[in-house]
Amino acid sequence: MAPPAKRARGLTLPGYKYLGPGNSLDQGEPTNPSDAAAKEHDEAYDKYIKSGKNPYFYFSAADEKFIKETEHAKDYGGKIGHYFFRAKRAFAPKLSETDSPTTSQQPEVRRSPRKHPGSKPPGKRPAPRHIFINLAKKKAKGTSNTNSNSMSENVEQHNPINAGTELSATGNESGGGGGGGGGRGAGGVGVSTGSFNNQTEFQYLGEGLVRITAHASRLIHLNMPEHETYKRIHVLNSESGVAGQMVQDDAHTQMVTPWSLIDANAWGVWFNPADWQLISNNMTEINLVSFEQEIFNVVLKTITESATSPPTKIYNNDLTASLMVALDTNNTLPYTPAAPRSETLGFYPWLPTKPTQYRYYLSCTRNLNPPTYTGQSQQITDSIQTGLHSDIMFYTIENAVPIHLLRTGDEFSTGIYHFDTKPLKLTHSWQTNRSLGLPPKLLTEPTTEGDQHPGTLPAANTRKGYHQTINNSYTEATAIRPAQVGYNTPYMNFEYSNGGPFLTPIVPTADTQYNDDEPNGAIRFTMGYQHGQLTTSSQELERYTFNPQSKCGRAPKQQFNQQAPLNLENTNNGTLLPSDPIGGKPNMHFMNTLNTYGPLTALNNTAPVFPNGQIWDKELDTDLKPRLHVTAPFVCKNNPPGQLFVKIAPNLTDDFNADSPQQPRIITYSNFWWKGTLTFTAKMRSSNMWNPIQQHTTTAENIGNYIPTNIGGIKMFPEYSQLIPRKLY
C-alpha cells in the first residue's frame, strides 16, 4: 500500500503551521494565537476562492480581522503578518462587504440572559444617514485613525485619535483631534451621535470558553466646581476621643481638587442581577480582558437669574463653554478607587448619575498619646501637622496629564486597555484540614439504616500511620495534613503608623457555625440611592454584611491549647482558654493575638461582591507584593486602567481681577453621556457529580426584591458569587 500523501506545508514560517502561503488547512492545532489567527484567515480565503472571488489581489474583511487579532502580537511571525496586511490594506483594492465569507457564519451571540435562549435577537437598526456622510468625509481627508493602546505598557501615548467626525448645523466641519491616551472627536452643534447600550453579550467560543462583553451607559450630570483651586485640608476627630474609642479616629490630611472622577470600577455598573445569576450559576472561572470608555453628546448650559421676586432661572445652551477631560494613562496621579467609598457611577442605567470629587491623601504628622489601660477615663491627646518636607507630594492634574477641551456635541474616547490579571475562581471550597486526604479506616460499619447509627473506629493508640504529636494517640484532631487551609488571624488589632492608627486588614473567609464575623474578616457595606438603597426611602442608609462562601474561617472563642495528654508548654501550665488573661489585662486572650500564617498556609482569593464590590485594583509599588488585596479580586500586574477626570472649564465674566484668587464665574453645568465596554473570558462549569447543586434563583417570597414598587422604588440586594462547590484536594 502506498504511503499516505504528506500535508502541504507551503511557505510557512519556522515554528508555525499556518502562518504563510500555500499550506493546507489540516496541519493540526495552531502553535500560538498568531498561528490560530492565520488558520482562520486561511479558512476565510478558502471560502472566498470557492465562491469565485480572488482574495489575493483584494483587501478583504478576513485581512482586516487578521490585522486586529495580531495587533498586540509579541511573536515575530505575528508581527510580520500584521504589517504585511497593513501594507496590503494601503495599496490593494477592497472587496465589498457582501463578499465577506463570514457575514452569514457569525458565532452565537446572546444579547442578554433575560431572553429565552431560543428567541431571536432584534435586528440592528440602520445607522443614520449623516454617519455615512461623516465617514466618507473623514476617509477622504485621511483622518480615520484607530487607537488600541495598552496603558499597562507605562508609556504615555501622544497619537491623537478622532472618536468621530461630525457635521455642524450649518454643514461645515468643526472640532479636532486630541492627544494623550485618548482622543476627542471632531464636534459640531446639532449633530451628535452615539448609542445607549447596557446589554451583556455571551459569546460561546467552544471548548467550554465564553467571552462576556458587558456594555454600560449612563447620563452624567456635572456641576461647575465650587472653587478653581487645590486645597490642603486637615481633618480632626469629630467623635469622642476617650480611651477605648480609638476606632473613632478620623484625623488625616487630604488634598481637595476642583476635578471630578468618573469611576466605573464596581460590578453593579456592568451587570444586572439576571446577568450575575447566569454568571454565578454557569461559570467556574473568570478573568478580565479589556476595558474602554467614551464621553459623547456633551451639552453645556448656563444659568441666569432674573431680578424679579421671586427670581426666575433661565437656562441657555452655551456653545463656547468647555468641558475639560483628562485621562491618566501612566497612573501618574494618586490612585483613588471610588468603590470602597460607594462613589462609583450609579447602578441603575435609567437614572442619571454624577461623578465624585477627586481628592487624595497628603502626608501628615500624627502625634498620639493614649492613656494606659489603667487610666481608662483619661483623655487621649492628639494633634496633626503638615508632614515632613521630605514626604510631601502635591499633584495637579493640569501639569501631570494632557487635558482635552470638549464643547457641545464633542466626544472623547480612551482607547482600549488590556488587563494582565490572574483568573478568579467563581466556586467555593468546602474542604478544611479535617477533610483532606484519606479518612481513617472503620472498625465497624452500621447495619441499621439511619444517621443516628454511626460507624466506629479502632482505639486511638492502635491506629497505623503518622502524625506530629510525640505520643501514641492518633485522632482526627492530631492527624497530619499536607497544608493549612486558612489560618488564625489576629483580629480587631490596630497598628500605629505616621498617619495614625489603622485596623489591620484580614483576608475575608466564611464563618464557622459559631458566626464569628469579625475574626473572619466579614465586610460591612453601606450604600445610598445610586448603589442599592431603596430609591424612594428617606430612612437610614442601606447596609449588609458580606461573608464569602469558602470554608476556611476560624472560631477563636472555641479554640484551645491543651497540655495533657500532649507535652506542651503554655502560660498557666494547664489548659489555656480564651477567658485566661495575659499580662494582667482582662478581656484579652491568646487566640486573639495568635497568627498562624506561614509557608504551609493555603488561601482562596478575595470573593467578588455583587453589586457593590470593586473589580480591579492597582498593585502596590513595593518590593514585596501582597498575595491578595482585600478590596478587589483582580490585581493588575502592571498599571491599571487610567483614571478619567472631568471638570467644567472656568466660564468667566468681564469682572476679572488678576490679584484675586477667586473670579466671578457664569454658573455653568453639563450633561453628557458616558459609555464603556468591559470584556471578560470565562470557563463554563461541567457536571461531574451525581447530586445537583445549589444555584442562585428566585422564589415567590423574594421576587419582589428585583422589581419596582408601585411608585417606582427599587433597591439592589447583594448576590452570592461562589455557589458552585469545588474540592481542594
Swiss-Prot record:
Keywords, A to Z?
Capsid protein, Clathrin-mediated endocytosis of virus by host, Cytoplasmic inwards viral transport, Host nucleus, Host-virus interaction, Magnesium, Metal-binding, Microtubular inwards viral transport, T=1 icosahedral capsid protein, Viral attachment to host cell, Viral penetration into host cytoplasm, Viral penetration into host nucleus, Viral penetration via permeabilization of host membrane, Virion, Virus endocytosis by host, Virus entry into host cell
Query: What is the protein name given in its UniProt record?
Result: Capsid protein VP1
Q: Which family does it belong to?
A: Belongs to the parvoviridae capsid protein family.
- Please state where this protein is localized: Virion; Host nucleus
Q: Where is the composition biased (Gly residues)?
A: 173-186
MF terms in GO? metal ion binding; structural molecule activity
Motif Nuclear localization signal in this chain: 4-12
Region called Disordered, residue ranges: 1-37, 94-129, 163-186, 437-465
Positions of the region Phospholipase A2-like? 18-63
List where Polar residues composition bias occurs.
Answer: 24-34, 98-107
Q: Which GO terms describe its biological process?
A: clathrin-dependent endocytosis of virus by host cell; microtubule-dependent intracellular transport of viral material towards nucleus; symbiont entry into host cell via permeabilization of host membrane; viral penetration into host nucleus; virion attachment to host cell
Q: Name one GO cellular component term.
A: host cell nucleus
Which superkingdom is the protein from? Viruses
Instruction: List the biased-composition ranges (Basic residues).
Output: 112-128
Which positions in this protein are listed as binding Mg(2+)? Answer: 330
Q: Which InterPro entries match?
A: Capsid/spike_ssDNA_virus (IPR016184), Parvovirus_coat (IPR001403), Phospholipase_A2-like (IPR013607), VP1/VP2 (IPR036952)
Q: Share any extra remarks.
A: VP3 might be a post-translational cleavage product of VP2 in several autonomous parvoviruses.
* Record text about domains: The N-terminus of VP1 is sequestered within the mature capsid. It contains a phospholipase A2-like region and putative nuclear localization signals.
Function as written in the Swiss-Prot or TrEMBL entry: Capsid protein self-assembles to form an icosahedral capsid with a T=1 symmetry, about 22 nm in diameter, and consisting of 60 copies of two size variants of the capsid proteins, VP1 and VP2, which differ by the presence of an N-terminal extension in the minor protein VP1. The capsid encapsulates the genomic ssDNA. Capsid proteins are responsible for the attachment to host cell receptors. This attachment induces virion internalization predominantly through clathrin-dependent endocytosis.
